[in-house]
Amino acid sequence: MPAATKDSDGGWKKFLWNSEKKEFLGRTGGSWAKILLFYVIFYGCLAGIFIGTIQALLLTINDFKPVYQDRVAPPGLSHTPRSEKSEMSFKVGDPSTYQKYVKAMHDFLQAYNDSKQENMMKYEDCGDTPKSYINRGELDNNQGIKKACIFRRSWLDKCSGLEDPTFGFSEGKPCLIVKLNRIVNFRPRPPTSNDSIPEEAQSKVQPDVIPIYCTNKREEDAAKVREIKYYGIQEGFPLQYYPYYGKQLHPQYLQPLVAVHFTNLTMATELRIECRVYGQNIAYSDKDRYRGRFDVKFTINES
């Protein structure tokens, strides 16, 4: 085999540029131009198809009304303060153990301060007793921005944070602020019978309000979870705050709240409590523990 010379390059230089055939990487200028033109047209068509499908999709979307709302699940029931795994543990004699809960409640209730609801161009007084739904028109902007019902923080009484800034945590009598999550154009329907409601909660069934009831989740805790008080409009979610028209049409909307006050919990033991709302179109799911209900675990110690 002849020895390789210093000029030997394996032919790669000629492959890069063949001066005899005027080829770059094995193709002439005309060939490269045809390939470039092909890919420009090919990817241009792909981009056109993609843009066309997006435009077609956007034509089916209403800016104000959900198209497939029949597939939306019933609203979830959530509470403030939230905690990891819904477990709340604190010491009555150590404010640092419950300060994060108190701060979360104050932050959440800022929007419900009277000073934030003074503009009567954005808010209206819907009363402090339950009423039927308020019809503010269709889900479009023909009538402009919808007014929101006022909900006064003071209606939460001892759980408002106005008189007791610790929301009962400093006494071992904690509060939870409960709300139904927002769903556009959803109208919760109150129960019409007591068939699906625990006997202890049947007195809460009344027109124009969605009742809420909390109790011990485990039978062995029945004697340890005693008096529970509820604050808000008729201790439930009044219908005049529904429906919700969405962020664009209802930017000032305030959800009605219910404060749950646990006034007599046994200390130094783990207690699991479940809260549920009751309505004709409110369902529960084992796969979603916040659909129409939630449970929370308290562990309260003296110090």
From Swiss-Prot:
Ranges per topology, Cytoplasmic: 1-34
Q: What are the UniProt keywords, alphabetically?
A: Cell membrane, Disulfide bond, Glycoprotein, Ion transport, Membrane, Potassium, Potassium transport, Signal-anchor, Sodium, Sodium transport, Sodium/potassium transport, Transmembrane, Transmembrane helix, Transport
Question: Which cysteines are cross-linked by disulfides?
Answer: 126-149, 159-175, 214-275
Write down the InterPro entries for this protein, in alphabetical order: Na/K_ATPase_sub_beta, Na/K_ATPase_sub_beta_sf
List the molecular function annotations (GO) for this entry: ATPase activator activity
Q: How does it sit in the membrane?
A: Single-pass type II membrane protein
Where is carbohydrate linked to this protein? 113, 194, 264
**Cellular component GO terms, alphabetical:** sodium:potassium-exchanging ATPase complex
User: Which locations, inside or outside the cell, does it occupy?
Assistant: Cell membrane
Major localization listed first in the record, in broad terms = membrane
Q: Which Pfam families match?
A: Na_K-ATPase
Topological domain, Extracellular: which ranges? 56-303
In terms of Gene3D superfamilies, this protein maps to: Na, k-atpase alpha subunit
Free-text tissue specificity from the UniProt record: Detected in all tissues except liver and cardiac muscle. Highest levels found in intestine, ovary and kidney with marginally lower levels in brain, spleen, esophagus, eye and pancreas, intermediate levels in gill and low levels in white and red skeletal muscle.
BP term (GO), one: sodium ion export across plasma membrane
Family to which the UniProt record says this protein belongs: Belongs to the X(+)/potassium ATPases subunit beta family.
Partners and quaternary state?
The sodium/potassium-transporting ATPase is composed of a catalytic alpha subunit, an auxiliary non-catalytic beta subunit and an additional regulatory subunit.
Report the function annotation for this chain: This is the non-catalytic component of the active enzyme, which catalyzes the hydrolysis of ATP coupled with the exchange of Na(+) and K(+) ions across the plasma membrane. The beta subunit regulates, through assembly of alpha/beta heterodimers, the number of sodium pumps transported to the plasma membrane.
Q: What is this protein called?
A: Sodium/potassium-transporting ATPase subunit beta-1
What lineage, starting at the top, does this entry show? Eukaryota, Metazoa, Chordata, Craniata, Vertebrata
